[in-house]
Amino acid sequence: MKYREIADGIFLDRPNRFIAHVDVNGTVETVHVKNTGRCRELLLPGAAVRLEVSDNPKRKTKYDLVAVRKQELGWVNMDSQAPNKVVGEWLSKQNFDLVRPEFAYGRSRIDFYMEKGEQKYLLEVKGCTLEVGGIGYFPDAPTERGVKHLHELAQAQRAGYRCAVAFVIQMEGITEVRPNVGTQPEFGPALAEAKAAGVRVLFLLCHVGRDSLEIVEQREG
């Protein structure tokens, strides 16, 4: 996945979930943050950030904040739309007969439905931007929706689908993701239930480029 044009900046502050103030070449710009999560461990005053430049003259903000440099870790892509985009590209190379995004199942919309021959597959995508002590954690904010998705995947697996949840690790040097039970206590048991039902847990390791995000390795959880 590539961004059209990238500019560099220095993060100043974040008045609310949707916007931030960033120093771009000495000018304070109001930018859109492409992640409504807290990201408090990432968006620290003085942190280097990368901004996607918009070509839409009707927008209120010229830039989207898509990546931030974390000390001792490197660049973290924090664009919440990026995981589904890179997984869509990745799936297109996996020899499925059919790949369909946003598939309705039960009371949820699962990110991807695939077919290969007579077999049907479901894949739910989760982006990971939270790192503590060299380990990735999900979620970084409360998500009842994420818990519901795991229950739906377990049910679908029992019904004959082949199901997986894929954690897209949006930073380099991290190879596994663990449940952040401190933020969402139910997520850990729901993930364990899904695994017990046969749902695969995938860790998708990424290369974070200046203007790109690319899946480079798949590991089993």
Model-derived regions: residue spans:
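Short nucleic-acid-contacting surface segments enriched for D/E, G, S/T with interspersed K/R
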Residues: G37-R50, A154
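Beta-strand/loop nucleic-acid-binding surfaces
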Residues: T27-E41
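Short aromatic-glycine-enriched beta-strand elements
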Residues: N16-H21
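Nucleic-acid nuclease catalytic cores
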Residues: G134-E144, A154-T183, L205
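Acidic-basic catalytic patches of nuclease active cores, encompassing PD-(D/E)XK
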Residues: R40, E72-P101
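Domain-level recognition of nuclease-like catalytic cores that cleave nucleotide substrates
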Residues: Q170-G221
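Flexible glycine-rich surface loops and low-complexity tracts that mediate binding to linear polymers
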Residues: L44-N56, L205-C206
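Conserved catalytic cores of phosphodiester-cleaving nucleases, focusing on short active-site segments
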Residues: G9, I110-D140, L153
